[in-house]
Amino acid sequence: MARVKRGVTAHAKHKKVYKITKGFSGRRKNTIRAAKAAADKAGQYAFRDRKRKKRTFRALWIQRLNAAVRPFGMTYSVFINGLSKSGITVDRKVLSDLAINEPAAFQAIAEKAKAALAA
């Protein structure tokens, strides 16, 4: 059986790890042991934060909506209640975008929600 030298495979594996840790600082980018650990941890953070990003953005939309409906004399929860009573099914992302980019359209929606609460 022929002798297999491991240099080519090892170099390829190391190169793969270094590609992931490019941009990291200190030993974490150029020492294989530290780079492997850093790459693993980066993967864990990436996985966790892909889930967390969804929560964070929903919270941001809610904060924006709360701020946007205050001038109409409502809080966020009252506004959402009014929307459900008036049968308006627009999600928070779109409502938040409307509040920022189309204030007139958002005002019309807010007034409909307020009218549904009064009725």
Swiss-Prot record:
Transmembrane ranges? none
UniProt entry tagged with the keyword rRNA-binding: yes
Family membership noted in the UniProt record: Belongs to the bacterial ribosomal protein bL20 family.
**InterPro entries named in the record:** Ribosomal_bL20 (IPR005813), RIBOSOMAL_L20_CS (IPR049946), Ribosomal_protein_bL20_C (IPR035566)
Q: Could you state one GO biological process linked to this protein?
A: ribosomal large subunit assembly
- GO annotations of cellular component type: ribonucleoprotein complex; ribosome
Q: Which UniProt keywords apply?
A: Ribonucleoprotein, Ribosomal protein, RNA-binding, rRNA-binding
The lineage is:
Bacteria, Pseudomonadati, Pseudomonadota, Alphaproteobacteria, Hyphomicrobiales
Q: Name one GO molecular function term.
A: structural constituent of ribosome
Q: Which Pfam families match?
A: Ribosomal_L20 (PF00453)
From which organism does this entry originate? Nitrobacter hamburgensis (strain DSM 10229 / NCIMB 13809 / X14)
* Record keyword Ribosomal protein present: yes
Q: What is this protein called?
A: Large ribosomal subunit protein bL20
State what this protein does: Binds directly to 23S ribosomal RNA and is necessary for the in vitro assembly process of the 50S ribosomal subunit. It is not involved in the protein synthesizing functions of that subunit.
